[in-house]
Amino acid sequence: MGQALNVKLYLITDEECLQGKDLFRTVEEALQAGVTLVQYREKNGQGGAMLQKAVALRTLCHQYGVPLLVNDRLDIALLAGADGVHLGQSDLPVAEARKLAGPDFLIGATAHNVAEAIKAQRDGADYLGCGAVFTTVTKKDTVPLGLEGLRLICETVKIPVVGIAGVTAENYFAVLQAGAEGAAVISAILGQSDVKAAVAAFLQAFDHK
């Protein structure tokens, strides 16, 4: 892609949130409305089908000049020609992924606390997804990091930080005020009847930060 990483509004796909809507059409609506980064996430998908979707999403995202990342699966990200991968704490270590993918491949890492954030930065992550910032239905067993925890991470590391989990257009401003450069969003965009309006609400909040 050859462009600077922009994590302002980071869309993560989850087909369960689509409520019957078409994945590609919905992602395109979000791209048209101004999301700045897309992550293809499918926790229990089959490799071949995931690769096909990743290739299609990469093509779609690149039409709008937006990078595509793949959640967890470095192999699929590389084979699909995606721009990067996002790795959780139980996935392939960031340092090992960097060895395989090279210096120009985007690698994001999940961090739940300062220690994990420092390690991910040291190991070569380009950005951090930090949370859960707020309580959320999809992460019932997770103790929220909270805005203060997010602020502490933002003050500690030098790479961009994205707030994850429970972020809505209404609390997005508070996430930015804590020092995050953006937010990763699933249901607050994909689960809405008007995807473009949902994206616009986030961007309006960003413009008033």
Annotate each predicted stretch with a short phrase:
Residues 181-182, 187:
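C-terminal structural segments of small proteins and small subunits
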Residues 1-92, 99-126, 142, 152, ...:
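Conserved N-terminal beta1-alpha1 strand-loop-helix module at the mouth
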Residues 146-150:
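Short alpha-helical segments enriched in small residues
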